[in-house]
Amino acid sequence: MGDEVWYATIVGVIVLSGLSIFYILYLAKMRRTKTNAAWKQAATELGLDFTPVTRIFGKYRMSGVIGKQLSCSVWAYTKPNSQGGYTTVMNYDVRFPQRLNNVKELLTPNIQSKLLEVNNVLKKVVVSDDSVNSIGMHGFIRESEILVQNVKLLIQLAELIIPNEEVDSIFEEI
């Protein structure tokens, strides 16, 4: 009688383990489906291209040109951290149509105020001669409204920096 109980216990543990794994994979698939939908909606609203992620740990990315002027990319990926786990990182990059010389001279008080506003939302905002970006933000955004808001903030900042004769409010187009 003891062998049957042992056998039934082993089979029960194996079945429960299998069901648990399938349930976790199912939850991961549902989460990926919702995230793909949110990123697709944000990309459509911004006029960017997005290819849905099909793998469980795939890299999310949307990119394109806004108003024929600014090249815009948003991407997220998972990387190992120092504690042996993984961290998800969000990156935003808006590139100017052409390289600006000495962009620091273009930072008027109005632009500095906008830079502070953007930095309060995105953190780690960097303005260079060829782009405005926020690279390495920890966490992952799954809501389309927040993705759109963050990209629009960077676009607004980039529009303020570009000399006026180069842009006719491309922000109005989106």
Regions found by a protein language model. Name each.
Residues 1-36:
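N-terminal signal-anchor transmembrane alpha helix of single-pass membrane proteins
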